[in-house]
Amino acid sequence: MKAIHVNWTKPFFEKHRLRGHGFETLKNLNSKTYDQLDYQLLYTMASAANWKKHNGPIKLYTDSVGASFYQRFGLLDLYDEVDINFLNGYSKSNVDAAYFWTSGKIKCLAHQTEPFVFLDQDMIIRNKIP
């Protein structure tokens, strides 16, 4: 079964306004360009590679900023398919990315027409799922 990762970067650029647990490390990144911590890249790699090894294809939904960032590290090669158009289009909407920071993910999930497994990028499946 196909799995999906989603990386919508628009909330990163509103990081000073993000509310909720887990955002302190993001707020402390001083970069004005999109960035992730090293451990985030590593768990993304582990998640995609383990899914492919044990369960099948994996697709990434991201935007142009996320695709450029992942390309720098060779991460796009981990995916069987990469879609930047969907989230590029969604990023043009008036949604408040700081308040609705998971909405890019939810829109991608609602966009699916076939069975799939959604994986947060820090979810690592190390066996075949039944």
Show the residue positions of the predicted features.
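N-terminal anchoring/stem segment of glycosyltransferases
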Residues: 1-91
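A short linear-motif detector with a strong N-terminal bias
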Residues: 37-39, 87-88, 95-98, 117-120
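Short, conserved acidic/polar surface loops in the N-terminal third of protein domains
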Residues: 70-74, 96, 128-129
